Structure formats: C-alpha cells, structure tokens
Amino acid sequence: MSQDIQTQNSYSDELYSSQIYSTQQPQQPQQQPQQQQSTFSSQQSQSSSYDFIYSTPQIHSQNSQNSQFSQNPLYDDFIHSTQNSYSQRVSSQRSYSQKSSSSQISFSQIPSSQIQSSQIPSSQIHSSQIPSSQNQSSQKSQFSFSQIPSSQIPSSQKRFFQSQNDDFVPSSQVTSLQDICLPQPIQQQQQQQQQQQQQQQQQQQQQQQQQQQQQQQQCQPQQQQTQQQQQQQQQQQQQQQQQQQQQQQQQQTQQQQQQPQEDDDDYDDYDGYDNYEDFVYNEGEEGEEDYEDYEQENDDDDDEDEDDDDDDDDDDDDEEEEEESQQQHIRSRALQSRSSQSRPLLRSGFKSPISRLSQTKTSPEYIYISSQSNTHTNQLGQSSQQTNSPNVHFNSLQQKKKQQQQQQQQQQQQQQQQQQQQQQQQQQQSQQIIGSQSSQSSQLPPTQPPVEVPVNLGRLIPINASHIPINLNLKREDRIVVGRSSSCDARLIDNYLTISGKHCEIYRADNLTCLKHIPLCKDKTDCHKNFGMLIVHDISSNGSYINGELIGNGKTRILRSDDILSLGHPSGDLKFIFESEFQFNFILDIKDNVNNLNENLDYKKLRTAYDNARIENKNCALRDYYFVKEIGSGGYGIVYEGLYKLNGKRVAIKHIDLLKNGSTSKSMELVSKEYNALKNIKHRNVIEFFDIVFSSTDCFFIVELATNDLSNLLRKRCVDEDDIKRICKQLLLGFNYLHNLGIVHRDLKPENILYNEFKQGFSIKITDFGLSSFVEESQYLQTFCGTPLFFAPEVIANNFFSNGYGKSCDLWSIGVTLYLSLCKYKPFIVDCRDLYHSFINGNLGFTSKKWAKISNYAKDLVRRLLVIDPEHRITIKEALNHPWFTQDRRFFKKYPKHYKSRAQPKTQFFVECFNVYYDLKSETGFICFREHFDNLETNYALFKQNFDNNNNNNNNNNNNNNNNNNNNNNNNNINNNNNNINNNNINNNNNNNNNNNNNTNTNNINNNNNNYNNSHNHNNNNHNHNHNLNNHNHNNNHHHNHNHNHNHNHNHNHNHNHNHNHNHNHNNHNNNNNNNNNNNNNNNNNNNNNNNNNNNNNNNNNNNNNNNNYYNNNINNINNNINNNINNNNNYHQQYTQHTTM
C-alpha cells in the first residue's frame, strides 16, 4: 500500500508542475473571520430561497493572503453536518451520483492567482462560481456578463441571455441568477400544450357537429328525435370535459405547492457540494471508507438492475459500460492525487446545468485545487454568491415529469377513444335514418379480380440422365408445350427425329374445355375435384404413350402419379415418370388386387363383373373410366363415382346385379331396347345417359354425376317458397319431357331428385327412372317396403290386380314432394289410420303454423295434385299453367275457392288397397300380407261372379219383353194393349179408355193384359233398383257384413222377378191362343180362359218358391265363406299387432 501511495505522489507532483502555473490577479482586501462567517451564512440563507432545477458549481470566496479556508472552524462544522446528512440519504441517491460523477466538479477554494482563464472554458463557468466579495451593494446575486464574448457561449445557452448585440450581453437585461439559469417551467408549457390540444379537439368536434347537422337537415322530420338525443349526448360530453379540466388544474396546483418543499429539504441535506463524489474526495480517510461502502451497494443494485433490464437494447448497455470504465479511471486518478495533496484531483469536464441542456461533451482535462489559496477572483473582477446545487433532486424531478407525461398521454388516449366511439354511434344512427329512406343499398363491385398464383403440381423426371426434368408450375389456364421447337416451353433434343416440333401439351385437369359453359358454383369444391391432376394432349404425328398405351392425335388422357409418359415410341429413350405433389390413393385400378374404395365393399364381385363385361364386349366402355369411390347404394345396386380417362370428367357408374334381381334373358332384351332409347335423352332437368354395358350377369350404366339430393337439402337448410317454386317447375318440365317420350317414373321421391347449386339457384336432375323394369313385382314391393307415402294409389292397385296405371302417378309423387318441401313434414302418417283416412278422403289440413306463411296458390296446387282418382287429378300442362307459376289472378278465378277431392265410386277400391298396404313393414309382414291378400282376392272373385249374373238377368228380361210385343201384334186388341205396355208409366188413363171401347167379348182379356202390364212394369222398376243397389253393396261388401246380408235379400227378389217374367211369357202365349179362339168360339170360352189364367198363376208361384229355396241355399254358402274370411282377417290383424309390439 505504501508503494502505491508513493507512485501516486510522484505522478501528482509531475502533473501539478506541468499544468498549474501562476496568473496575476488583483488582490482583494482582507476580511475578518466574523465577516466571512456572516457572508457564508447569508449565502446559505440566500441559496435556500431559490428553487433551482439544474445544479451549479460552487466556489468559496476567501482571502488568499491572510487566511486559509481549510482552517476555518465554520467550514469544519459544515463538513461534519453534511457528511451525516449524506450518509443517511446515500441509499436513495446513489443511482444519480454514479451518472453525475463523470460530469460534475467542485471549484471550492481555487485561488484566482493559480488559475488561468484560458484553461477553463467560459461555458463551464457559471455565475455562482464568481466570488461575492467585490459586489456587496446588492443582496441578491446580480452581476453583468457584458465582458463575456458570445462566441464562448454555446448555441443552446444563448436563449437565456437575450442579447441585443452579437458579441456581448448587456448587464442591464440580467437581473438575477434565476433569470439566467432557469428556463420556463415545464409544467406551464405542458399546460399550454394541453390547452391547445383541447381547443383543437373542441374545434374538430364543432366541425363534425356542423356536418352532421347539415346531413340531418336534409332528412325527413322523423329525425328530430334523433337530433335531440345527439344534442343531449354532446352536452354531457362537454360537461365531462369541463370536469376533467378542473381536476387537472387542481392536480397541477397541488404538485406546484409540494415541489418547493421537497426541493428545500434536499438542499439542506448536502449544502456546499455538488454530489456525493465531491463530498468523498474533499474529505479524508472517513470519506474513502464511505465511498467503498457506497461502491459495494452500487454493485448490488447494478446486479438487480441487470435482472430487471434484460429487455433493453444492446446500445444502451455498451454506453453504460463505457461510462463505468471512465468513472473507475477518474476515481483511481483522484485517489492517487489524494495521498500526496490535501485536495483531490478533479476532472475539468464537469457539465454545468446549461451544458447539460446542450448535451455537449468535453475532453477530460484535469486541474489541481491549491490548499494555500483562500480566495478566488475572476477575470471580470466580480464576485458571485455561493449557491447549492441539488443534483440528486434533478433525477427525481425527471422521474416525476415522466410519470406526469405518461398519465396525461393515457388520459388523452382515453378521451380520443371516447370521442371515436361517440362518432361511430352517431354515424350508425345517421346511416339508419338514411337507410330507412332508400330501400336498396348501393353495393360497389370489387375493383380488381383476385390474382391467381401458379401451383407446383409436380415434375416429369426423365429416365435417361441426359435430359432435364420438367417442372410443372401451372396456373389454371396455363399450358406447357413439349417438343423440339425453340418456341416450346420444354425443349427436347432428339437425334432420331421422332419428336415433333410441338409434340404434346400438358395442362391442368381442372381446366376442362367442356365445363366452361357451366357457371361458377357457390361451393367451389365441386369445380376443383380434379385439382392436382394433369391432362396430356397429343398433337404429334408419331404419338404419345401413357404406360405403353397410345393416346392418339388430337386426343387427351389423364396423367396420374407414377405414370410413365413416352414420346415418339413406347420403348424409346424419351420417357418421363410423373412425380406428383398430390397423392391420389382414392383412384381404384380394377386390374390391381387392392381394394382402396371401401373396406365393406365386396371387391371380388366388382372385379368379376368388370372382367365379364370386358370379355363379352370387345369395345367395352368401362376401359375408359377409373372407379374413384363408392357414393351410394340401394335396392338396384351400388353407385360409384367414375373418372373419364380422356378428359377427367366425373361420372356416375351404376352396377346392377341381374341375377340378384331375378331378371331373365328376355327381360334383358327388352331392357336393352328401352335403354337404347334412353341414351338419346337430352334435357337439362333429366340425368344424361352416356353409355350402357351389358353382360350375362351384370349391367353397368354410365350417367351424369350429381351428388346432392333434395332430401339432404330439405334436412340441412331452410329453403324459401321461391326456391321451392323453381324446383317444382323444373320437375314438371322434366316429367313433361319424359311423358312425351312415353317414359313413366312411378318411383319419384326426394332421394331421386338431384341438384347442383349455382349462383342463379338450383339445377334439378331427375334420376332412376325406368329402372323398375329390372325388378319383378314381388321384389319391387319388398324393395320399397315402408315407403307408400310417395306411391300413387293406382300404382299399388296395379301391383295387386294388374289393372294398369297411367302417367298421372308421377303427379301424385310430385304433390307429396311439394307438400314435404313447403312445410318440412309428411302430409300424413301411414301408421295412423284416422289421419290416413282423412287424407285419402281428400281432407287436407293446412292449419299448422308453418302453412301461415305459404301462399294460397301453393296450397291450391297441392290439393289438385293429391287427388285419389287419377282421372280427376291435375295434368302436367295444367300444373305448368297454374297461377303459382304464372301469378295470373284471372286464371285463378277458374278454380273454385274451396276445392275438396271427394272419393268417387271407382276410387273405393284404391282405398281398400291402401288400408291393406299400410301394414306392410317387413319381410314377415309381407308373407302375412300375401295370405291376407289371397282371401281378399277370393272375395273379390265371388262378388265379380254375382255382378256378372246380374248383368245376364237384365239381358234376359229385355228379350222376353220383345217377344211379348211380337206376339201381341197378331190381334188389334193386343196391339192396343202392347201400346199401353210401352206407355204404361206415362199414360195409364188412356189405356183404360181404350179398353172400354173394345168389344165385350175381349174385356176380360184386356183386363188381364192390363194387369199383366202393370205387374211387368213394376217388376222392371224393381229390377233396375236392385241392380243399382247391388253395385253399391258390392263395393262396400268387404267392409260391412250387414250390407252383405242386405245384398242377399235383393238377389232373392231379383231371381223371383226373373222367374215370374218367364212364366208370364208363357201365359202370354196362352192368352194369344185364347184370343184366337175367341174369334171362332162363343162367349162361354171366356170362363175357361180365366180359369186357365188362374192356374197358370198358381204354377208360377210354385216355381218361384222353388227357385227362392235354391237361391237361398247358394247365398247361405257364400255368406259362410265370407264370414270365415273375415274371421281369418281379424286373426291376422291380432297376430300382426302382437308381432310388432314384441
């Protein structure tokens, strides 16, 4: 330690002798210690009265000839007091002292004789450094800077002097030190700035209010209420702003009152020193120990600060390290000088308050402080009053100012956000007002179309290493031309000249020319199904090959991943393997043994069916298609999604197993003829047929693809009435086209109605028509078991009795589909008999809430489509002209307001078929149904025989009447009687008159004839009456047993009449003979004739009784059979209900 002190002393002596030299200064008169004490105390009191923001260097003025400042007892007391105060406050102020150690310096007791003016720049000498001994006239520190050249004053400091000349500052304009050192208070500036900002905001608000008022004046008087609300909101806003301003002013006044008190306390703690480092340097060994403790605390705090400031920039860290190195260097030099001299070495690069403002950097120059000098005089010959500089307090003030600024910024941001919210609310209100006036809002189209980016689909890797790979980065409409020409995108070199100038073109498969006429879909996934696939278009003369198969000039072919493209020859050198960026594992190659379609799919059956079709058909169309995946299955077979190899078009391939559906060779011939006609079908609302492939066991139909069906649309989305109207009209147009070709669907339901959705609406496609010819009638019923809702009544009746049905059965299915689409529930529940019968009888109810929004036109069309009798059902042409589509009220007047489809006599049989068919639910139910239906069929046969017998009896009666008329022609009297027979119901009185005019010989005969005529006419009436009743009862025979017995009685009467007529004809023959005898015999024969007539009547009665007994026996047998059938039917119902409940 001693060696270090000696080296420090030697170095300080050399530095002292080289840098310090004497200067001639005027001597000052000596001052007594009392006077010095008084001046010191006055200076101390004076310094406490000022609140300086920036620190100033201190110089103690003393007499250099008579006394030394270090021997003054007042100074020693002051040092001890300040040392104690600093030790208490060092922990709170050490952060600032570390930064200010490199820039602050103390000029205490520097004798004026030893300091040259050229060594101290004028910018670093402050008014507080000038001794105050030469100017005792003024109590305040008033001095003049008239002799300071303006060149030595920095530019940032000139604004404090307000000089009139460029060279010197007149002393008349400088009154005090406070006027020079202190700038305008920052808080006042901030207040002014805030006031200006508030004024600007108020002006902006006023302008906005004026604009809104102008807009509202143009609106209707309805806006008056909204204007009043806006005015109230504006008033509330202004009141809030005023309250905020008052609060801010109160806070500012409180801060101004608190700050001077805090500053005075800080001044009292360390009067006489600029910072803690000056205090340590000017003290002895005690100060050195304090300084070491202070360094240790600084190091601990620095470690904590480093943890907190990890997010700071690297530049700030570098600057801090440089400052710390400089500080350590200065401290080491100062400690070296302290061992040899009584005053430490200080850095002359101390920054004054004004130099801090300008942030000027000075070179590290060093001076010594002499221990012998007691006074210091300046070149100006003026003294300055000693002041205290609160350097530590400066940092705290800056922190407070920063906090205030942050608070003010936050408040301003909050105000701006509130204003923006209010403006948005006002704009929304104004837009609502304007929108109520205009019904349509103007929407601008997009200014620029979206920019398409090329997609990397893969590359063509050559097998021969001499060729270059071809990268396939393509847009949708791009084409890569491959060939030998220089204009080709991919130029190839061929020594054998097998490559054409333009050999082939490669483009994306989702840019098909055949699909350009189709508008863009809303759901663009359907348009991009072929995304990632390529098409090769052969335009060469020698040909292009894919996997060894020739494409052909002008033809195209899909290029899949790992396919080999050969140019010129299949075994040539120019071969490329297509390495795709998209792996298409979903494409099934029938030649492979891998099933990647569906795990549950029987792949062997599909493969065998495919092989059989290719063997039996030389030009099999299935070779041109890929099987992609399974998309559906049903009673007919399985449906696959296919891909056309030539152009990548998507199709649907339907596979039907003919052996499973029970088809024969004859039916296949009929089907082939039918589907050859279907190939020519081309309508926008009907699925298009592309090709049909037959084999002995299977059949493949290649048709247009449409994956969405109407059932999913109605289940997932809410479709309005206008869209349903378009769908229904397209259905009617499609069926009108099919019916004109003689094609009947008979199995229409929402699952068979496919659609594609476009921007303009829905495009409907009718599918699965004509496929029922592949299935037998029994299989047809089993296949569609449980879906009688969409079957027309005549279709079900045709399956039972083969009575035939017409084209109107499809209209029934359209009506049920329309009903379901409008209200989203079925028109009737098949399991509920009451509701089912009410629907069948024509009682359609539209009482649900969902029907309240449906128009009357739609309801009327549903009523006309759902009519039981097909003859009274609306036709397609009438439906297309319905007012629901035409919206013509004149046409609607032709229809009745309340239309009810009453069940006609013909439709009663259809109702019977529906009552039986609703029990058909499963295979077991179908077997029971067949037994039940056989009983029904036998009953129907019995009734049909009775119906035929009645018709035959009517014919016999007519013949007998004709014979009577011919026999009566032989006699004039009988002719008269026959005339009476023909007109008996109308002219009975005339007949009586004619009888009186006849001879007395024939009166009895005439009377008998008259009686016969009456009875005959009566019998004819009875016969006609019975015939009508028979028909009525025959239709209701299966329902009511009582009616069946009633029918039995009527049949008895009918047979009685028939026998009576037959006997009566015989009597007429006798009468004719009697009449002839009357012409030749006497009047006595009349009695004989009367007796004969009576006998004949008796015989007739006997015969009638015998016939009645015979017929009664027959009817009893029939009744027994029918009762047995009814009992069997009841037992079937009981068994079936028990089976279903279990």
UniProtKB/Swiss-Prot annotation:
Ranges in coiled-coil conformation: 186-302, 393-434, 1090-1132
TM helices/strands, residue ranges: none
Extent of Acidic residues compositional bias: 261-277, 283-325
UniProt keyword terms in alphabetical order: ATP-binding, Coiled coil, Kinase, Nucleotide-binding, Serine/threonine-protein kinase, Transferase
GO (cellular component) term, any one: nucleus
Gene3D superfamilies: 2.60.200.20, Transferase(Phosphotransferase) domain 1 (1.10.510.10)
Residue spans of biased composition, Low complexity class: 17-72, 83-157, 187-260, 333-348, 432-443, 949-1034, 1068-1133
Domain annotation Protein kinase: ranges: 625-885
Amino acid composition bias (Basic residues), ranges on this chain: 1035-1067
Polar residues biased stretches: 1-16, 158-178, 374-397
Active-site residues, Swiss-Prot/TrEMBL: D747
Pfam families per UniProt: Pkinase
SMART domains in UniProt: FHA, S_TKc
Residues that hold ATP according to the record: I631, G632, S633, G634, G635, Y636, G637, I638, V639, K654
Highest taxon in the source lineage: Eukaryota
Catalytic reaction annotation: L-seryl-[protein] + ATP = O-phospho-L-seryl-[protein] + ADP + H(+); L-threonyl-[protein] + ATP = O-phospho-L-threonyl-[protein] + ADP + H(+)
Renumbered residue ranges of the record's region Disordered: 1-359, 374-404, 432-451, 947-1142
Enzyme Commission number(s) from the entry: 2.7.11.1
Family designation: Belongs to the protein kinase superfamily. CAMK Ser/Thr protein kinase family. CHK2 subfamily.
Protein name from the UniProt record: Probable serine/threonine-protein kinase fhkB
Species whose genome carries this gene: Dictyostelium discoideum
UniProt lineage: Eukaryota, Amoebozoa, Evosea, Eumycetozoa, Dictyostelia
